[in-house]
From Swiss-Prot:
It holds the Pfam family Oxidored_q2. Its EC number is 7.1.1.-. NDH-1 is composed of 14 different subunits. Subunits NuoA, H, J, K, L, M, N constitute the membrane sector of the complex. It is found in: Cell inner membrane. InterPro entries: NADH_UbQ_OxRdtase_chain4L/K, NUOK/Mnh_C1-like. This is NADH-quinone oxidoreductase subunit K. It is a multi-pass membrane protein. The lineage of its organism: Bacteria, Pseudomonadati, Pseudomonadota, Alphaproteobacteria, Magnetococcales.
Length: 100
């Protein structure tokens, strides 16, 4: 496949992720999945440019992005589980009512 095909695929995935955030603002899990989809699109760009430029920097950077994304997802889900235990909902509109 050519570089353009990878860039079009990444652009489509990123656009789907952005639309997922804007169209579904009430569910935290859907928002987190959309963010992960956007990170996947960025990683595809890194790997595609790294392959076509014959430089391993993009592929190595992708490993760091995947690691940070996994940590972000784990922390986000842990916060979400704690929030669900306290409020019995995962509605985004309820999150701003936290005491602090």
């Amino acid at each position: 496949m050519s570089l353009n095909a990878y860039l079009v695929l990444a652009a489509m995935l990123f656009t789907i992720g952005v639309f997922g955030i804007f169209l579904n603002r009430k569910n935290v899990i859907s928002i987190m999945m959309s963010i992960e989809l956007m990170l996947l699109a960025v990683n595809i760009n890194f790997v595609a440019f790294s392959h076509y430029l014959h430089d391993l920097t993009g592929q190595i950077f992708t490993f760091f992005v995947v690691t940070v994304a996994a940590a972000e997802a784990a922390i986000g889900l842990a916060i979400l589980v704690t929030f669900f235990r306290n409020r019995t909902t995962i509605n985004v509109e309820e999150i701003d009512t936290l005491k602090g």
